[in-house]
């Protein structure tokens, strides 16, 4: 009995993955959605690990992501450590740039919350690109 349930599970995941990899949208709800996202994210990490730099070299290079404008934090004047806020009340980085989160909310690069994407995948369907954005 457990074997048949496991086989059914694997078949549904493989079917969902093959559908997601196509350009068409596929409807995924509940556990199918979660399993598919985990599979997609794990497989992308596996590919990066196999194609990329060995783990030992990655540890030596350290954090490759750096903020564009480093700034010193002042212990004497903590108000200087706060982010700048413009007239609209939105946080801005030094140089008038919007934080990265706000940049991604533009129409061209819209990012939904995980719950919104899960709801969308269940009702309308979603693509591989949508799901891989969660990784």
From Swiss-Prot:
Disulfide bonds join 29-122, 41-135, 121-126. Keywords: Cleavage on pair of basic residues, Disulfide bond, Hormone, Pyrrolidone carboxylic acid, Secreted, Signal. Residues 1-22 form the signal peptide. GO terms for biological process: positive regulation of feeding behavior. It is found in: Secreted. Pfam families: Insulin. Its main location: secreted. Highly expressed in rectum with lower levels in uterus and ascending and descending colon. GO terms for cellular component: extracellular region. The modification Pyrrolidone carboxylic acid is found at residue 115. The keyword Nucleotide-binding does not apply. InterPro entries: Insulin-like, Insulin-like_neuro_ligands, Insulin-like_sf, Insulin_CS. PROSITE patterns: INSULIN (PS00262). Residues 49-114 form a propeptide. GO terms for molecular function: G protein-coupled receptor binding; hormone activity. Belongs to the insulin family. Heterodimer of a B chain and an A chain linked by two disulfide bonds. May have a role in gut contractility or in thymic development and regulation. Activates RXFP4 with high potency and appears to be the endogenous ligand for this receptor. This is Insulin-like peptide INSL5. It comes from Homo sapiens. The gene is INSL5.
């Amino acid at each position: 009995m457990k074997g048949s349930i496991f086989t059914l599970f694997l078949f549904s995941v493989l079917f969902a993955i093959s559908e997601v990899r196509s350009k068409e949208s596929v409807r995924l709800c509940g556990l199918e959605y979660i399993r598919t996202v985990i599979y997609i994210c794990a497989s992308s990490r596996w590919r990066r690990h196999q194609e990329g730099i060995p783990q030992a070299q990655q540890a030596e290079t350290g954090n490759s992501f750096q903020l564009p404008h480093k700034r010193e934090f002042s212990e004497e004047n903590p108000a200087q450590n706060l982010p700048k806020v413009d007239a609209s009340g939105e946080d801005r980085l030094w140089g008038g740039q919007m934080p990265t989160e706000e940049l991604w909310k533009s129409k061209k690069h819209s990012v939904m919350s995980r719950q919104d994407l899960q709801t969308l995948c269940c009702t309308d369907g979603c693509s591989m690109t949508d799901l891989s954005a969660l990784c």
